[in-house]
């Protein structure tokens, strides 16, 4: 049984960890922290978890307690894992971080986008980027895993087959992405209020979103060269979901793109390449650790359109983190993650 600690248990990704791990036969949550809710029973904050965590309460983060865990998940804002990851690694505890703290390889690039110096640059070289469909072998040997962001997960999985095969003009890639409001977190903010988001949709951060350098870094690895990427995120009136509409120009029209995508993801348990002509819906992946993809070539031209959908809290966050944990500890990758999406 893998002993699990969670730092930052009161946000949406924290409670999603609890939901997923409640169904995991080989993992037990033994510590969950929250400075603001210390002493409060988990089941009192989250009634949906009654009967699953009745003996578990939030506590103040303590290195000695967390260091007794086999793995600690960080479901925290950026900067928190910087301060604690080194001590936990020294104690022999594995660290899986959902924040952006260890996703970028360049400390200066991180500081540019997050507005503060990187707090643990000595750990960047060791950190493994936790996209299993790319780095599964490295994840098996990792001590520190940086779980990809939600937009980067949907976007990279959609573009990867084209870039790995050298079929796309990488100088002009476009990612037009839509997100549900849970991606903004649980904190109170005017832009996330029901009356602000309901019956409306808007683009934001067009000049540059923090996920842009992460996406470019992953696509550059896949292509083996620098890429030109325009990334435009949008906020939509739904709670969960990412829908990425991706555009690329192909350099060889003779390739069967449907077969290319099906072959690339044939052995990936959490990527579903839909039949030709399909249009994946975000509701089809709600609550599931699945990226559902469809590839199109309108009018048989040289423009490829890839549609990629995920649940931002599952394959875009906590589910992907549990997938990484399963790989890291030599478990069946699908443990605790095999449930289907919820409909309607």
From Swiss-Prot:
Its main location: cytoplasm. It is found in: Cytoplasm. Signal peptide: none annotated. Its EC number is 1.2.1.38. PROSITE patterns: ARGC (PS01224). Pfam families: Semialdhyde_dh, Semialdhyde_dhC_1. The keyword NADP applies. It comes from the Bacteria. InterPro entries: AGPR_AS (IPR023013), AGPR_type-1 (IPR000706), NAD(P)-bd_dom_sf (IPR036291), NAGSA_dehydrogenase (IPR050085), Semialdehyde_DH_NAD-bd (IPR000534). NCBIfam families: argC (TIGR01850). This is N-acetyl-gamma-glutamyl-phosphate reductase. It comes from Pseudomonas fluorescens (strain SBW25). The gene is argC.
């Amino acid at each position: 049984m893998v002993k699990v600690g969670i730092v930052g248990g009161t946000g949406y990704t924290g409670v999603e960890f609890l939901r997923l791990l409640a169904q995991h036969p080989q993992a037990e949550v033994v510590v969950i922290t929250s400075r603001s809710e210390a002493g409060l029973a988990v089941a009192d904050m989250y009634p949906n978890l009654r009967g699953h965590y009745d003996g578990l309460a939030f506590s103040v983060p303590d290195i000695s307690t967390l260091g007794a865990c086999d793995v600690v998940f960080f479901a925290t804002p950026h900067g928190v894992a910087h301060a604690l990851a080194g001590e936990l690694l020294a104690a022999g505890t594995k660290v899986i971080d959902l924040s952006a703290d260890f996703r970028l390889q360049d400390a200066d690039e991180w500081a540019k986008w997050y507005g503060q110096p990187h707090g643990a640059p000595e750990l960047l070289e060791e950190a493994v980027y936790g996209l299993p469909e790319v780095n599964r072998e490295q994840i098996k040997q990792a001590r520190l895993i940086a779980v990809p962001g939600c937009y980067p997960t949907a976007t990279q999985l959609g573009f990867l087959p084209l870039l790995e095969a050298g079929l796309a003009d990488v100088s002009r890639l476009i990612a037009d992405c839509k997100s549900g409001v849970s991606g903004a977190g649980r904190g109170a903010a005017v832009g996330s209020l029901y009356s602000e988001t309901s019956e409306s949709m808007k683009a934001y951060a067009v000049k540059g979103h923090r996920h842009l350098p992460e996406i470019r870094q992953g696509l550059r690895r896949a292509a083996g060269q620098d890429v030109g990427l325009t990334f435009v995120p949008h906020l939509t009136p739904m709670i969960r979901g990412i829908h990425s509409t991706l555009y690329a120009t192909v350099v060889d029209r003779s390739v069967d793109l449907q077969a290319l995508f099906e072959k690339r993801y044939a052995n990936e348990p959490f990527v579903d390449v839909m039949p030709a002509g399909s249009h994946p819906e975000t509701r089809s992946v709600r609550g599931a650790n699945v990226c559902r993809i469809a590839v199109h070539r309108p009018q048989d031209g040289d423009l490829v359109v890839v549609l990629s959908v995920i649940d931002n809290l599952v394959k875009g966050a906590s589910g992907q983190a549990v997938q990484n944990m399963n790989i890291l500890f030599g478990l069946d990758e699908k443990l605790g993650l095999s449930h289907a999406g919820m409909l309607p």
